[in-house]
């Protein structure tokens, strides 16, 4: 197996156990010839990343400083301030030609590292961003933003969370929007951007804000979207 076929996936975190998403993501990537190693320990994962051998880094984790008092009960187990060596491992991976596939909670991660939102092209803003309860969501692809990721895909609906009011970098062009279909007293919520691509210092980056669990990740259209996202990030075909 060549390095181009290998993926390192960082998963897990409070309220988002890895078993909710890891099997779905690793299975669909394996079908594309991409073998995945999974780590829940972020620092250990970044040590592995720094050693090389991975072309794709997938973040499907929920790890941040947890400064808000309401997270006090979870802080000892789950709070994370990313070390300088871990930051260098991620940027080193990208500068060496590696790719990044960021899923769902990745926009909440590493809130003590400003460069992360620059790499990702967006971030969760505490006190501003939010989401309605997990429910049926409607996803629409933007015909005004054609891209290999979305070409020929049909709009779809599935159970998920829609992250609203994220900060987006000025140059980000969303490829899809979604809304919770019962967010406002049974009425649909606001449309929010949920998918975009980006290049950071030559590295290809994809962020897919959907994917709370297998009910979303196993939807046929969403599966195809993630397959294409990985292929595009790796520069395949």
Task: Go through the PLM ranges and name each one.
Residues 1-55:
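Aromatic-Pro/Gly-enriched surface loop or interdomain linker
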Residues 5-7, 31, 57, 167-237:
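A glycine-centered loop/beta-turn motif at secondary-structure junctions
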Residues 11, 104, 178:
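Short beta-strand/turn micro-motifs composed of small residues
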Residues 14-15, 43-44, 63-66, 106-110, ...:
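Solvent-exposed loop/turn segments at secondary-structure junctions
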Residues 29, 118, 122-201:
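Catalytic beta-strand/loop cores that center a nucleophilic Ser/Cys/Thr
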Residues 52-70:
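Short, structured active-site "lid" loops
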Residues 64-152:
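A glycine-rich, often tryptophan-bearing local segment used as a flexible ligand/cofactor-contacting loop or short
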């Amino acid at each position: 197996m060549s390095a181009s076929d290998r993926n390192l996936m960082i998963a897990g975190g409070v309220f988002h156990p890895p078993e909710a998403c890891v099997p779905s993501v690793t299975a669909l990537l394996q079908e594309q010839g991409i073998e995945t190693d999974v780590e829940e320990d972020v620092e250990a994962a970044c040590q592995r990343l720094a050693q090389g051998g991975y072309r794709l880094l997938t973040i499907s984790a929920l790890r941040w400083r947890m400064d808000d008092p309401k997270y006090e009960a979870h802080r000892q187990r789950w709070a994370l301030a990313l070390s300088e060596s871990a930051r260098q491992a991620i940027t080193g991976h990208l500068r060496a030609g590696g790719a990044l596939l960021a899923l769902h909670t990745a926009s909440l991660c590493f809130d003590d590292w400003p460069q992360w939102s620059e790499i990702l092209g967006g971030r969760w803003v505490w006190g501003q961003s939010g989401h309605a309860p997990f429910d049926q969501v409607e996803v629409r692809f933007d015909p005004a933003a054609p891209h290999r990721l979305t070409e020929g895909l049909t709009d779809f609906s599935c159970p998920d969370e829609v992250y609203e009011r994220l900060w987006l970098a000025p140059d980000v062009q969303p490829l899809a929007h979604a809304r919770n279909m019962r967010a406002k007293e049974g009425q649909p919520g606001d449309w929010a951007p949920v998918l975009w691509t980006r290049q950071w210092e030559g590295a290809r980056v994809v962020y897919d804000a959907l994917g709370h669990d297998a009910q979303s990740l196993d939807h046929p259209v969403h599966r195809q979207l993630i397959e294409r996202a990985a292929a595009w990030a790796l520069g395949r075909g």
